[in-house]
Structure formats: C-alpha cells, structure tokens
Amino acid sequence: RAPEAHLLHPDLEEVPKPVSVAGGTAGSTAHLAWLDGGGAPFDDVAIVISELGVADEVNRPLWVHLELPPDAPDLDLLAGRVTDSDGQVLSTFEVAAAPQAGQYGAFYHLTFPLRAGSYSIDIVGAAASEPQVKRSLTAEVSTVPDQGTWLSPVWLGTGVTPTPEARHGTAFTIGGWHLAPVSGPELTRTAEIVYFGFVVRPALAEEGTVELLSRVHVKRDGMSLGRPFEVPLDTAHISGDLHMYGNSIGLSGIPEIGPYDFVFEVIDTNSGASAERSVSIEITE
C-alpha cells in the first residue's frame, strides 16, 4: 500500500478525516475554527443530553440531544469533531440543522456511529454564520451484550413523531418513532410522558410471543402514591432478535400540582430481565 503522502491530491496538505455523522460532510476549516474560538451566547443555557442508543443487536451509537431556549435563533448548521482518548481527531462533520419543537425550545439531534471506546466530541451550532452554542462532551461507547435477554435504557419523552423512513439507530428514534426527550422537570397536568425502548433476544413464551410488562411508580416526598400502574406492553419486531416497545402515561390523574418522582420499570416476564428509568417532575397547572 502506498504511503498516505502519495495518495493526496496535489492541492491537499493532509489526509481528509472521515465524516462523523450520517448525512453530513467533513467539517470545513472555517466552521471547525469556531470550536477553538471564544464562547457563544447560549453556552450556559443549552440543554445537552448524550446517551448510547441502539442500532441493531450489536451496535450502540451515541445519541446527542441539544436544546436551546425560546429566545435563541433557529440554528442552520451543526459542526464538530470526534477525538479519541489520545486526543487524535478521528472524524469531523458539518450538517444542516433541523430544529424541532421541544419541551423548552427548539432541539436538534445528532447520531454518532462509533466503535467501542472512549471519545471526546466537540459541537458548535450556528445561525447566519454566527456561532450560537458550543458544547464538549465525553462518551464511553460499548456494544450490546452478546448473550441473554437485554433491555435498552427506557427513554422518556414529552411526545413522539412518526418517522418511518428513519434509519435504524437514528438518535432518539425507536422503531420509526422519534422522541422529543424529557429535558427538564416542568410539565403541566395536561402533558403526558411517553416511554420507549428496545429488547434484544427476548425470552419467548410458548406461543412464540414477546411478553413485556411495565410498572410506573409515582412517589412524593419519598412515599409511593398507591400501587404502581402495571400494564402489559405491546412490542414490534424490528429485525433479527431486536424488538421495540412504546407506551405513555398521562399526568391528568395526578392528585395535585407539585414535585413528584416517577419510576418507569420494564420487565421481560419470561426471563426476568428488566430496565428502569427515574425522573423528577414538577407538575404545574
């Protein structure tokens, strides 16, 4: 194989980096320079959530949720880079931003299909060629366990949008349903919380069916409010040994406004495998 120097176009001075995100292009020098400049107006108020998602029975891409307050302009560009644990830049990206309505303001999702390992990710969002927000985060990427029944994290949202054309593994998208994640504690009594997730290699019943059960515990001041809400969950087959579920709970039945803790538990009844997510919510009128 020829050395890298012999593969370069005469006008290039270095080997181009791979693209970090699907649908994007390599980050331009000008846009990547924003990452090393001064602060941006919404750095201190942006909400950033990063979690490992699920693409198939093996791979867990990094999902990033970036949400800005209502007074922020809609972003038109997201750019950034991915570096490894040694500080070497592995890939860069820039992609047109697609704002969507979130719990507090517009949100943006990015999907990073990374191999198992440790990474740092730097992201900048811009509007009209002006940086509006910058954020750096670290991630430890792993794969799905290769044996036994495994349940993904339970993802909580304020709503979902059908996106049947979405690729498997797209950020916060479960079986063609795109979540607007719960990004803060305030919700009204007219709101609902949706909860979605995946199960890999479920233990099938005699009829060959997947049997999942959800329990939603509601607590106030550390005390449970009655018995948990317990319902069987419908599932849908995605591919191979990968299945998904989704459900929701309305908040109109909560007795009064104030702070509550919700615990969402999902159980594969045939194997006993389970996953759980807790969230603190301040319910308002």
Regions of interest found by a model, annotated:
Residues A2-E285:
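Intrinsically disordered, low-complexity terminal regions enriched in Ser/Thr/Pro/Gly
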